[in-house]
């Protein structure tokens, strides 16, 4: 009888240990299966969290890294102007390049070295979309046009931290998706996957880092761009001014097009790139990426 009680006690003890182990493991992985807030509601909380500024003036440095990983990057000074919820202008000025990009109420134009570029939008310009478009419904519509289905949401982890994933079921990273900090609802990762017929190496990942609060508005002080896991460019913000006043002409696309002629076709641009040194080629490649 004593032996039976002893074995029963041992059995129950082992069963309890196994139960506790299973419970702990379940808790560790629960975030990926727990209840998830609806994507549109997450975007609403995100835009509310970023603040209520009416406009922003941002001074920053854009660093373009050489793809060979052996040479130092090219640094360019940029000035950004945000007028919420849907007007934006960036001015890139240096001895090598002069670039203006304007987005105003759904229309866009890019001027490079005094000439209007063939194309007015590209994915390197899109990083500002998450910071610009408000309210959440407007941002949801803009993300949808870029392949992010915000009606799909899940919980995941990135570098050990829990996060909301919009546009995919974690851990799937093959579709366009936006990641937000689970506690603050601030975005920190945007994966822009390439088209199915293109190589995955062409997918672009943008990371929003070092968020800082300016009065009642949050802004990332560092933004990184990765292709195939390689850092190809980064943005370092020096200053952010809240609610500055801007002339409406700065965002007048029709007015800008009247000031600058149409640039040469792409074929002519390729011909012009011959016999350039490495620094010039880097700048020309930068211009080409933004056309």
What are these model-derived regions, one by one?
Residues 34-44, 48-52, 107-177, 182, ...:
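Flexible, processing/modification-adjacent segments and terminal tails
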Residues 36-37, 159-254:
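Gly/Pro-enriched, hydrophobic low-complexity segments
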Residues 72-77, 87, 121, 126-132, ...:
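Subset-of-secretome marker
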Residues 253-291:
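Gram-negative outer-membrane assembly/targeting C-terminal domains
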Residues 35-115, 149-151:
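N-terminal mature ectodomain segment of secretory-pathway/periplasmic proteins
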Residues 15-27:
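Bacterial N-terminal signal peptides
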Residues 63, 85, 93-95, 105-108, ...:
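Solvent-exposed coil/turn segments that connect beta secondary-structure elements
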Residues 1-12:
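N-terminal secretory signal peptides that target proteins for export/translocation
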């Amino acid at each position: 009888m004593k032996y039976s009680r002893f074995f029963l006690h041992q059995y129950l003890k082992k069963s309890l240990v196994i139960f506790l182990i299973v419970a702990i493991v379940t808790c560790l992985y629960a975030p990926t299966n727990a209840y998830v807030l609806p994507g549109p509601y997450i975007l609403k909380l995100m835009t509310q969290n970023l603040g209520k500024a009416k406009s922003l003036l941002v001074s920053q440095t854009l660093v373009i890294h050489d793809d060979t990983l052996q040479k130092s990057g090219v640094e360019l000074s940029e000035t950004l102007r945000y007028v919420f919820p849907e007007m934006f202008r960036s001015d890139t000025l240096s001895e090598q390049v002069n670039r203006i990009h304007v987005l105003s109420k759904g229309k866009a134009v890019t001027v490079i070295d005094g000439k209007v570029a063939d194309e007015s939008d590209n994915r390197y310009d899109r990083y500002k979309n998450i910071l610009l478009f408000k309210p959440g419904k407007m941002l949801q519509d803009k993300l949808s046009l870029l392949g992010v289905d915000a009606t799909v949401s899940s919980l995941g982890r990135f570098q050990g931290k829990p996060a909301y994933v919009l546009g995919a079921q974690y851990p799937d990273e093959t579709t366009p998706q936006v990641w937000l900090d689970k506690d603050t609802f601030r975005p920190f990762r945007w994966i822009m996957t390439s088209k199915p017929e293109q190589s995955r190496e062409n997918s672009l990942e943008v990371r929003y880092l070092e968020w800082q609060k300016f009065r009642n508005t949050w802004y990332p002080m560092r933004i990184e761009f990765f292709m195939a896991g390689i850092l190809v460019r980064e943005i370092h913000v020096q200053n952010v001014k809240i609610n500055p006043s801007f002339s409406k002409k700065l965002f007048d696309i029709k007015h800008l097009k009247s000031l600058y002629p149409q640039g040469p076709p792409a074929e002519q641009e390729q011909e012009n790139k011959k016999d350039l040194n490495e620094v010039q080629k880097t700048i020309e490649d930068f211009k080409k990426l933004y056309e």
